[in-house]
């Protein structure tokens, strides 16, 4: 109770608060919760579609469980709303246990137009299934398939809230619509990553995807080309209906016509009802054209930015700048973009113009002292001020993105004794949640520059 009084006295989220942050301690740890399963929690995500002044909801995943929490504004607490369990895969001959690694939120536009709950929670992990759960009913809305191995990262398209992209250990990237079981686009092949893909992200306009993984490479995939845009538009239009899973993922077999059959009575100008009936039968039996569009070649590739595994990559919101984290022996986050410095042109005269671009411009490197462990996802503040990254030994590191000269964390703290796996900001930027290998869910609140330092020291 005394702790709650101190929290309220800070008035961290009052409307009279300054928009500037308290530099020495930009965020304060206000709540910490241990999940009942007491297993490692690998992923967390705020509902990015919640209003700024609405109570924020955050999902966490670890083991076979998905937990849903609310983050009240005026109380320093993390309140459990509900949870669900995905224990085993009974569809296979050998039962395998699910272990969830990543989670995101989607907004189903068809449900919204029909005055039904549009919020969906999407998660995946070891079994390669993508589960779409209705936030209100808590029931499984859809199960997306086609991924061949573990799912390591799922991200929602900022420009189309029905689309997700996932990174898989099967060395492929897939784009799904949450209302269709089969994927719409598969990215892979000889020009793709040569190992497990650990992380992906969309550009703000949805035209590009970044990817990274075990092979140290950074890749950019162009979705703005006409063929890809038209394919996605057709698919989204077909799926904008009450029925789900209407598109099939089969071999793109040409539509059967009389021209593709043996020389028939048509060429002899003699009616042949039997052949016409056979033609109709072929049309019924042969699947419709596939909803799957393959992409084999990235638009840009970097092979020398990182020297070890790259386990997290993110676009800086609203820009074409990127942040990527190396682990193992590297332990650093790089701030960069594809393309030459401003005013310069990439020289490709002696190269194959059909090959991906390889030029990059690096602006800054941030050291991550306790970042040797892999599968740690950082988060970028929606206000583009702070980058927060977890590390081994429960460490949490805050980097000031406005201070280009600083290479080390501006502020560090500890939330436990084991690795912090992921950080997630609320859309308003006032709340931060982190999850750990110990099973802790940790809440941080943003500290305004106008907060009395004496009051903050008491908390």
UniProtKB/Swiss-Prot annotation:
In adults, it is predominantly expressed in the germline, and weakly expressed in intestinal cells. Disruption phenotype: Double RNAi-mediated knockdown together with mes-2 RNAi results in ectopic expression of the homeobox protein egl-5 in the head region. This ectopic expression of egl-5 in the head region is enhanced in a nfya-1 bp4 mutant background. In addition in this background in males, there is ectopic expression of egl-5 in the mid-body region including in seam cells and hypodermal nuclei, and there is ectopic ray formation. InterPro entries: PcG_WD-repeat (IPR051243), WD40/YVTN_repeat-like_dom_sf (IPR015943), WD40_repeat_dom_sf (IPR036322), WD40_rpt (IPR001680). It comes from the Eukaryota. It is found in: Nucleus. GO terms for cellular component: ESC/E(Z) complex; nucleosome; PcG protein complex. Pfam families: WD40. Interacts directly with the N-terminal domain of mes-2. Forms a heterotrimeric complex with mes-2 and mes-3. Does not interact with mes-4. Belongs to the WD repeat ESC family. This is Polycomb protein mes-6. The lineage of its organism: Eukaryota, Metazoa, Ecdysozoa, Nematoda, Chromadorea. The gene is mes-6.
